[in-house]
Amino acid sequence: MKRNLITGGLGFIGSHLIERLIYLGEYVVCLDNFSSGNKGNLAKWNKNPNFKFIYGDILDKHEIKFDKLWHLACPASPKEYLKDPILTARINFEGTLNLLNLAKDQKAKMVFTSTSEVYGNCDQIPQVENFLGFVNTKNLRSCYAHGKRIAETLCFDFQRKYKMEIKIARIFNTYGPGLRPEDGRVISNFINQALNNVPLSVFGDGKQTRSFCYVEDIIDALLLLMNSNFKDPINLGNSNEISIIDLAKLIDNKIYANKQFSFMKSTNDEISRRSPSLKLVKEVLNWQPRVDLSDGLDLTIEFEKKKLKKLQP
C-alpha cells in the first residue's frame, strides 16, 4: 500500500484531501503542528488503521517513510500569515527545503500547493501560467506571495538537479465546508457575519472581482496532478469571476436577505481582479470544476448552520 504524507493536513484543503485518500483506501500520515486547522477531525481519523498523526513542525527535520508527499503546510489566510510574516517566509523557504530533502531521500513523488498570489497584481485576465508576476516586496502580503515563489524555485531546482517528480499547483480562491469563521477569508467572513445577523464587511466599493472554486473540485484536480507526468506550474481554480459586492449580496440573500453591508477602507495592496486561465489544466489533466458557486455556497452554508446548531445550549 502506498504511503501518503500530508503536511498541514488539519488545514482546510488538507483535511478534505485526507478524507478523500482515506475513502480511496490509501494510507495517510498527517504532519501538523496545530497552528491552525481543525483538530476535531483527529478523533474520527485516529480510529482508522490507515491513518497516522505526527505532531511536528516542517521547520524541524523528520524521519518519515512515504511514497507521495502532499506539501500543504503554510499559513494560508491573511490573518494567519500577517500575524507573523517572518515565520511565514521561513515556513515557505526552510520548511519546503526540509521536505524536498526528505522527499529526495525517499525517492517520493511530490505535489506542492502554491498560490495565485505569485502572479501579484496582474492586469492580464485570465492569468496564465507563463505570466511572470509582479509582487511588491514592501506589501504586507508579500511574505506569503514571495514565500511561495521561492518555494516554487526550490521545487524546480530539486526537479532539475535530482530528477525528482515534483508538481506545482497554483491554487486560486477555494471555499467549502470546514472554512474557519475566524480565518479572514471573504466567503467565511460573509457567511459568519450573515449567520450572526451583522452587516457584511466589504472592502472598498466591492467592485473588485475574484473567482471561487469548491474544495472537492480542487481535490479532484490535485489527485489527477499527482498521478500525471506534468512538471510545470498549473492553475487550479474556477474561472467564473464575481464582484465582491455581488458575492456579499448572494450570500446575504441565501441566509437572511437583510441587505446590510459595511463598506471598509481598502488596503493599498488590494488586487483588483483575479481569475485563472484553465486552458492548460483542461489539456493536461482533462479537468474542469463541476460545482457552481451557488450550489457550493448552499453546501457550505448548510454545514455552518449545522455546526452552529451543535454549539447552541
Where are these regions (language model features)?
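Short, solvent-exposed loop/turn segments at secondary-structure boundaries
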Residues: K83-D84, G178-D183
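Hydrophobic alpha-helix immediately C-terminal to the catalytic Tyr-X-X-X-Lys motif of short-chain
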Residues: I150, L154, F158, F190, ...
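Short, conserved catalytic or interaction motifs in soluble domains
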Residues: S36, P177, N238
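N-terminal Rossmann-like NAD(P)+-binding domain of SDR-like oxidoreductases, especially those catalyzing
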Residues: M1-T174, E216, L222, R273, ...
